[in-house]
Regions:
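Active-site neighborhoods and metal-handling regions in enzymes and metal-associated proteins
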Residues: 1-132
Length: 132
């Protein structure tokens, strides 16, 4: 690997490590009664403490809401009994790591199990030479 390639790889590694840390910490804050804004601000502050910056504003979507909802500065919406999607992006020198996770506050484990089974089936079906 050339020096440039190694520098790029290191930026991606660092962004991924920061993202992993912030995602794990932030998902623990998601519980009924906590505001979406509190969670988003925590994640954004941690990204800035640990690295270069955010790739995009923290996104928090609930239930059937499409992804990429970002709380506004005056948002007082609190979490309730719902499915929550947390999406965070980190960049280091412009190289981005992006991940999302779902937190189930709904008490509907069947939905989570069905999603996990569908993901496992898709992974099993994917691979080199598999037709589209």
């Amino acid at each position: 690997m050339s020096d440039f390639d190694e520098a790029v790889a290191e930026n991606y590694r660092e962004a991924g490590e920061i993202l992993t840390t912030v995602m794990a910490e932030t998902r623990e804050l998601i519980e009924p009664g906590v505001t979406h804004l509190e969670v988003a601000e925590y994640a954004e502050e941690r990204v800035h403490e640990l690295g270069d910056g955010l790739a995009f504003p923290v996104n928090i979507s609930v239930d059937a809401e499409a992804s990429h909802a970002t709380p506004e500065r005056d948002d007082e919406t609190t979490f309730d009994d719902e499915m929550v999607c947390l999406d965070i992006g980190v960049h280091v020198d412009g190289y981005i790591a992006d991940a999302a996770t779902t937190v189930d506050l709904s008490g509907t484990p069947e939905l989570v199990e069905a999603a996990e089974e569908a993901l496992a089936a898709a992974i099993d079906a994917a691979g080199p030479g598999v037709p589209e």
